[in-house]
């Protein structure tokens, strides 16, 4: 009987030791993420947390701009971050400012700018540059994001098409999450006739019809990447997260979200 109790106790001690070790190794990973990658990320969060025991603390904000919610602003203000999931071009700027660890960036996915109209309305032809230009001129109102895609449209593309002056008064910049909303929501309510954002931020939204990507000749491809923040306190756990996102399961989630995965290690 004594021997039996000894065996039981020894097993309990082993189990307790495993649980204690797991609790010690589990980390709270601070993640900053832009909206274009959020759909894929949100699908992976419960899987990652269940398999690793780590907890993801997520902060959302645009990759570019100087709003209080923008990731560059958050980092400059000293908000905690271990890993960033955002546009690669912005990461290069943050690296030069010493806010991102040089050499830590892993490229994850490619995205394009797309267009939506309100559900139930006619789908316009944007298959050529001229057709797209006509749609812009004919539209009564246009909505675009306050992040990378919208900045490109309002500062480069409209000028390139020679119609910036005609579009100025009918174009509207939409503040995105966390305190704002997707461009598609504005279009769905009928507050804008057409809307533009990253494809991954459009195709799963209710109340709109996805028209397609803007013409290839005008397209600005966006690359989403994941680096470590210079101030990361959970670098090892953050690297585990990056590898998980770059895995085949991560690639599947990215594809489902409308992104083109770059790796599936």
Each language-model region and where it sits:
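Phosphate-/polyanion-interacting regions in eukaryotic proteins
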Residues: 85
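Bacterial N-terminal signal peptides
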Residues: 10-22
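N-terminal secretory signal peptides that target proteins for export/translocation
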Residues: 1-8
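Exported/periplasmic ABC-transporter solute-binding proteins
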Residues: 26-69, 73-80, 89, 93-97, ...
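N-terminal cationic amphipathic segment used for targeting or macromolecule association
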Residues: 4, 14, 24-25, 79
């Amino acid at each position: 009987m004594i021997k039996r109790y000894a065996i039981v106790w020894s097993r309990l001690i082993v189990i307790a030791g495993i649980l204690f070790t797991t609790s010690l190794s589990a980390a709270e990973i601070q993640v900053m993420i832009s909206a274009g990658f959020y759909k894929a990320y949100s699908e992976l969060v419960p899987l990652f947390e269940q398999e690793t025991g780590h907890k993801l603390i997520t902060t959302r904000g645009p990759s570019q701009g100087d709003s209080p919610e923008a990731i560059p602003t958050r980092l400059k203000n000293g908000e905690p971050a271990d890993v960033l999931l955002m546009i690669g071009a912005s990461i290069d700027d943050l690296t030069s400012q010493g806010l991102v660890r040089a050499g830590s960036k892993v490229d994850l996915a490619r995205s394009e700018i797309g267009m939506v109209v309100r559900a139930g309305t006619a789908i316009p032809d944007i298959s050529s540059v001229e057709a797209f230009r006509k749609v812009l001129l004919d539209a009564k109102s246009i909505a675009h994001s306050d992040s990378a895609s919208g900045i490109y449209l309002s500062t480069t593309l409209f000028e390139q098409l020679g119609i910036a002056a005609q579009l100025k008064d009918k174009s509207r910049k939409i503040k995105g999450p966390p305190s704002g909303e997707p461009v598609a929501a504005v279009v769905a309510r009928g507050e804008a006739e057409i809307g533009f954002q990253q494809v991954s931020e459009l195709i799963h939204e209710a109340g709109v019809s996805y028209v397609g990507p803007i013409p290839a000749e005008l397209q600005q491809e966006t690359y989403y990447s994941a680096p470590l923040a210079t101030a990361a306190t959970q670098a090892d756990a953050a690297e585990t997260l990056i590898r998980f996102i770059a895995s085949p399961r991560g690639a599947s989630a990215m594809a489902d979200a409308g992104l083109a995965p770059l790796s599936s290690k």
